[in-house]
């Protein structure tokens, strides 16, 4: 695979290899055949980051080869959304011959939605001033004149200039209902929107008919908790990043959901609060004991669950675990399988043509 060529003819084979690999990894814990969810074979990534290379008068996007660390010029990127590809061309054309926008520009980040909105961030090794803002506003207006619904942001050390706004609103069709998700620049969002829809629908399916409340750790912008709110009496969710919490609060209102409570704290802190080890001012007015959480949802970082959180989740009858790293999932299952068994197993091809796998398991108490 090269950045400008996807081996789409190999899609089925690479997916089949992942299924076999996941089954092998999960064999000590389950003999289930994974439910398999396919990605679009191209234009599936809704975000991308590129370094910018200055070559005489020329200017272009590059990425670095992971093995050799050599530079690879990238003029098109079929893994990314069609809107990102349009913007890549338009941004280079708009910046290449503009000394103010070009000088000391070293990276461009793109974030797009299925609803065809975009935030583009330009990163600089220099101070950004009013002249930069004026030129950036002219570029933004020129892009919009090309029917590109784009917001521009300039970033430098300790500086962030958002010309209009630093977010876009995604609209996802999930189980016959449109979900609105505010996505903030430089915050985590699911990279493959088509796969995200399938993950949300799978999570809804495995939790249908649920009793009681849902507890979610690492909720981000509320991606899963808002979609799952329909299946539970109440949802209590934690997230540490301020921009994500603010986006989640907006998303609760935008989707007219009244049974979700977001708390800004780390999973480890919440574990301490639940166990009565510490009290937190942030929890004033929230009666944790009133929640009857029969199900806990975790979507941890690549490092998986820490040992304290492992112990904490074992107290719940049902554990829904979305993993972006099956190796750490299996490490966690060494502990979780002592008290729970795997009821459902899914493979989500979030990153086609790469070694990476995303998977989901539903665990129920033995």
From Swiss-Prot:
Classification lineage: Bacteria, Pseudomonadati, Pseudomonadota, Gammaproteobacteria, Enterobacterales
Q: Which family does it belong to?
A: Belongs to the class I-like SAM-binding methyltransferase superfamily. RNA M5U methyltransferase family. TrmA subfamily.
Annotated GO biological processes are:
tRNA methylation
Describe the reaction catalysed, as an equation.
uridine(54) in tRNA + S-adenosyl-L-methionine = 5-methyluridine(54) in tRNA + S-adenosyl-L-homocysteine + H(+); uridine(341) in tmRNA + S-adenosyl-L-methionine = 5-methyluridine(341) in tmRNA + S-adenosyl-L-homocysteine + H(+)
Q: Sorted alphabetically, which InterPro entries does this protein's record hold?
A: MeTrfase_TrmA_AS, MeTrfase_TrmA_CS, SAM-dependent_MTases_sf, TrmA_MeTrfase, U5_MeTrfase_fam
The record, for Pfam families, names: tRNA_U5-meth_tr
Q: Recorded E.C. number(s)?
A: 2.1.1.-, 2.1.1.35
Q: Which HAMAP family match?
A: RNA_methyltr_TrmA
| Protein name, entry field | tRNA/tmRNA (uracil-C(5))-methyltransferase
């Amino acid at each position: 695979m090269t950045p400008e060529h996807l081996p789409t003819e190999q899609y089925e084979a690479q997916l089949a290899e992942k299924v076999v690999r996941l089954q092998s990894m999960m064999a000590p814990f389950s003999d289930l055949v994974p439910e398999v969810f396919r990605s679009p074979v191209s234009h599936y990534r809704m975000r991308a980051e590129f370094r910018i290379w200055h070559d005489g008068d020329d200017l272009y996007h590059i990425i670095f080869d992971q093995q050799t660390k050599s530079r690879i010029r990238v003029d098109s990127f079929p893994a990314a959304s069609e809107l990102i590809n349009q913007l890549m061309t338009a941004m280079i054309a708009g910046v290449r011959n503009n000394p103010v926008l070009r000088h000391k520009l070293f990276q461009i980040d793109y974030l797009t939605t299925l609803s065809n909105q975009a935030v583009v961030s330009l990163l600089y090794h220099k101070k950004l001033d009013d002249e930069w803002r004026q030129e950036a506003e002219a570029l933004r207006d020129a892009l919009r004149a090309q029917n590109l619904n784009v917001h521009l942001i300039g970033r430098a050390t300790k500086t962030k200039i958002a010309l209009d706004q630093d977010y876009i609103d995604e609209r996802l069709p999930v189980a016959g209902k449109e979900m609105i998700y505010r996505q903030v620049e430089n915050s985590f969002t699911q990279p493959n929107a088509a796969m995200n829809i399938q993950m949300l629908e799978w999570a809804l399916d495995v939790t249908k008919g649920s009793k009681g409340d849902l507890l979610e750790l690492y909720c981000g912008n509320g991606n899963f908790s808002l979609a799952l709110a329909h299946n539970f009496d109440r949802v209590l969710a934690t997230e540490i990043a301020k921009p994500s919490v603010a986006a989640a609060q907006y998303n609760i209102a935008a989707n007219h959901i009244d049974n979700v409570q977001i708390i800004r704290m780390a999973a480890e802190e919440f574990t301490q609060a639940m166990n009565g080890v510490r009290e937190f001012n942030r929890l004033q007015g929230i009666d944790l004991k009133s929640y009857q959480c029969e199900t806990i949802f975790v979507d941890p970082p690549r490092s998986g669950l820490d040992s304290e959180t492992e112990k904490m989740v074992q107290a719940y009858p049902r554990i829904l675990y979305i993993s972006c790293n099956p190796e750490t999932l299996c490490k966690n299952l060494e502990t979780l399988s002592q008290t729970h068994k795997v009821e459902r197993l899914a493979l989500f091809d979030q990153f086609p043509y790469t070694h990476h796998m995303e998977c989901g398991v539903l665990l129920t108490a033995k």
